[in-house]
């Protein structure tokens, strides 16, 4: 972790204020901290709710919070207090970037809209995260991954069927992708400021990110889709009225919008079950599919005259897929991985979380890092999203305790110990002891 000089990281000297909780924007803060930014996480006196979420390991810290808040300083204050507003004003005056994911109604309540804070610092870059976008009936509400998965259509194409109902996609893919998009947004705005001297507001949303994640499946073309979509909508409505399961509904929908698609005929881009384990195959091009068939000694029925809309041809394709499954089930996964890769077919292991730490491809590239937590000791977690040759990217510390750096930060703003002690006594700020 300390093999490089922290001062040489690309965002060294950049100050970021993070008013955010749970996943999406805190993960953005992690990316910026890994790149060297001085990220100050501003929490309420009770702390980010993620502190008390899944995997509690300390009274005020969960495993999830630890992994989503490494490399940050932490202060805790009562946003509603007048004295806190003065603290925030001083923070903003010295900051470069604000990451804001408070509900839009709270921004107005606490005077933290972009128009408010830019009066204190016109060069500030203000990331406003409105989970569903600012407009519309959901615009003022807090956002959750499960809601946007459903609203965006992402779950309809990716979710599993659990007892007839769609299962939520986990981990929270929209949250994590939004964190990356948010980091891209503020760094792009930082570049604009370098060129022009101007700050600005930038925006991200979970809903927009979800639409992007589903982008190769959710689209509409006037030349081909209106009639198909009308037929699919009618069939889906009937299936829902009849109480069919989610999987049945999706199969009906897919049969109309993507004839011949679906798991029954997916031969080349999927996970297979070998004698011992699962493994992956990714053969999308004609050349790769030919190699796949050569390895297994099979012939794809589509190499001859074939019509997917013909029931007999469709059944032949289903039988072909089952044939491949039966052959593969006869040997162990490693045999097939080595054989496919030797013949140029993309293939790899299917790992559960505990196996990731022993995966050579991951360890050889330092994609997993070992960090030190002041109370928990050593732990392993994901590495930075990017690497740079001239300006190394790496985390420099673990997550902060609730209010761990409150006194340190306030002293840097010009507060003296007597003032800080008074604010602590009035329960306006919190300092970890």
Regions found by a protein language model. Give the residues of each.
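Terminal low-complexity tails and localization/encapsulation signals of metabolic enzymes
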Residues: 1-15, 239, 243-246, 252, ...
């Amino acid at each position: 972790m300390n093999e490089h000089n922290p001062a040489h990281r690309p965002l060294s000297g950049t100050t970021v204020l993070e008013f955010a909780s749970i996943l999406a924007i805190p993960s953005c803060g992690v990316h910026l901290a890994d790149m060297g930014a001085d990220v100050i996480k501003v929490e309420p006196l009770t702390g980010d709710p993620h502190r008390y979420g899944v995997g509690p390991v300390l009274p005020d810290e969960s495993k999830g919070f630890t992994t989503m808040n490494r490399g940050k300083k932490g202060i805790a204050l009562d946003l509603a207090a007048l004295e806190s507003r003065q603290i925030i004003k001083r923070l903003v005056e010295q900051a470069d970037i604000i990451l804001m994911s408070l509900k839009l109604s709270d921004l107005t309540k606490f005077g933290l809209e972009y128009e408010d804070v830019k009066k204190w610092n016109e060069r500030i870059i203000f990331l406003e995260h409105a989970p569903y976008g600012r407009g519309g009936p959901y615009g003022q509400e807090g956002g959750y991954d499960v809601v946007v998965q459903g609203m965006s259509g992402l779950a309809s194409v990716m979710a599993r069927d659990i007892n007839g109902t769609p299962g939520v996609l986990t981990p929270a893919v929209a949250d994590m992708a939004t964190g990356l998009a948010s980091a891209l947004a503020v760094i792009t705005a930082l570049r604009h400021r370098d060129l022009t001297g101007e700050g600005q507001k930038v925006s991200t949303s979970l809903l927009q990110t979800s639409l992007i994640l589903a982008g190769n499946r959710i689209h509409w073309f006037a030349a081909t889709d209106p009639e198909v979509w009308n037929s699919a909508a009618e069939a889906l409505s009937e299936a829902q009225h009849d109480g069919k399961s989610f999987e049945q509904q999706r199969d009906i929908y897919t049969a109309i919008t993507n004839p011949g698609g679906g798991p029954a005929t997916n031969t080349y881009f999927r996970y297979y079950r070998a004698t011992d384990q699962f493994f992956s195959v990714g053969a999308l091009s004609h050349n790769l599919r030919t190699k796949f068939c050569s390895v297994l000694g099979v012939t794809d029925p589509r190499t001859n005259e074939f019509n997917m809309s013909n029931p007999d041809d469709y059944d032949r394709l289903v039988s072909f897929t089952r044939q491949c499954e039966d052959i593969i089930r006869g040997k162990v996964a490693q045999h097939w991985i080595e054989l496919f890769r030797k013949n140029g077919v993309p293939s790899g292991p299917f790992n559960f979380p505990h196996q990731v730490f022993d995966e050579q491809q991951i360890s050889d590239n330092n994609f997993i890092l070992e960090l030190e937590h002041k109370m928990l000791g050593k732990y392993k977690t994901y590495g930075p999203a990017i690497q740079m040759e001239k300006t190394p990217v790496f985390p420099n510390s673990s997550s902060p305790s609730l209010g761990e750096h409150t006194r340190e930060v306030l002293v840097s703003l010009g507060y003296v110990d007597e003032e800080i002690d008074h604010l602590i006594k009035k329960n306006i700020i919190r300092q970890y002891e």
